[in-house]
């Protein structure tokens, strides 16, 4: 069973997302028209899937691999340099090269960024192997590496040629990674009331990992993101900002833990709960709504407990570095109801007061 949908960005060429019930890498062959292929993956995924992927490529291709360490802390300049050096050392040229990102969100982000900047842009293909990367980071063209002062601070908007994935990857995906991915899925439920209702009615099948339901879940999640990206590919109008619900708080958590604590999806789960509480603090929603929204998150196995190893001062400083901020104004994606999120400006003092009473 294959589900296919199209992403139509504002400024870039359209591309397909292919969600498969089985794992058949041959689906990407029509997109590998280049003669030089660099497969970028990490140590974990390489052991599981590299020997399955490489034989799917045709014999006349010049195929090389670049294997990075696994973890958010390796979404770094050093890892980027390793990819670029591999390309240069093997004389890969702009018109003959395609990068393949075989892995989760870190691999997709860093490979996409390498593709964006190598010789001013080369083709790349996304093969996301985690739920989180399937429904979020592989779609929409955001590519980046982290800086010691903040997450995703160095990057570019750069779209892939195609996204191919399969729910077969879940067979080797740790449960913690699966639940982390569910946080991004639940985020889309707060953006779309229809999807909220669908998730609510299919919760048991999702938690049981029913194949047909999971394919539909991934497809619907990608459709929601694709619709937003089509309106505002490069965050010029503000429409795309709603995709960052939970991320302002979540990114700060990751930064404070040096990207070695909560996984990205886990931090987003906590971040959504923080954004919900902040919305209640500001009078945008009732206490009952806040409880209902947080209960919905938790019902999918997602923890919303704030880490106890983060001090408020450090957390506030991390939030001040958020990319959405401008002219010393803090910007948050806040919720007024299911399907009603908005980008709002708040003062540093308002945030400090909220953090004081929420700890």
Swiss-Prot record:
Its main location: cytoplasm. It is an enzyme of class 4 (lyase). GO terms for cellular component: cytoplasm. Pfam families: DHQ_synthase, DHQS_C. GO terms for biological process: amino acid biosynthetic process; aromatic amino acid family biosynthetic process; chorismate biosynthetic process. The keyword Amino-acid biosynthesis applies. Its EC number is 4.2.3.4. It is found in: Cytoplasm. Its cofactor is Co(2+); Zn(2+); NAD(+). SUPFAM superfamilies: Dehydroquinate synthase-like. Binds 1 divalent metal cation per subunit. Can use either Co(2+) or Zn(2+). It comes from the Bacteria. Zn(2+) binds at residues 184, 247, 264. Keywords: Amino-acid biosynthesis, Aromatic amino acid biosynthesis, Cobalt, Cytoplasm, Lyase, Metal-binding, NAD, Nucleotide-binding, Zinc. GO terms for molecular function: 3-dehydroquinate synthase activity; metal ion binding; nucleotide binding. Catalyzes the conversion of 3-deoxy-D-arabino-heptulosonate 7-phosphate (DAHP) to dehydroquinate (DHQ). It comes from Francisella tularensis subsp. mediasiatica (strain FSC147). Gene3D superfamilies: 3.40.50.1970, Dehydroquinate synthase-like - alpha domain (1.20.1090.10). Pathway: Metabolic intermediate biosynthesis; chorismate biosynthesis; chorismate from D-erythrose 4-phosphate and phosphoenolpyruvate: step 2/7. Belongs to the sugar phosphate cyclases superfamily. Dehydroquinate synthase family. The keyword Acetylation does not apply. It catalyses: 7-phospho-2-dehydro-3-deoxy-D-arabino-heptonate = 3-dehydroquinate + phosphate. NAD(+) binds at residues 70-75, 105-109, 129-130, 142, 151, 169-172. This is 3-dehydroquinate synthase.
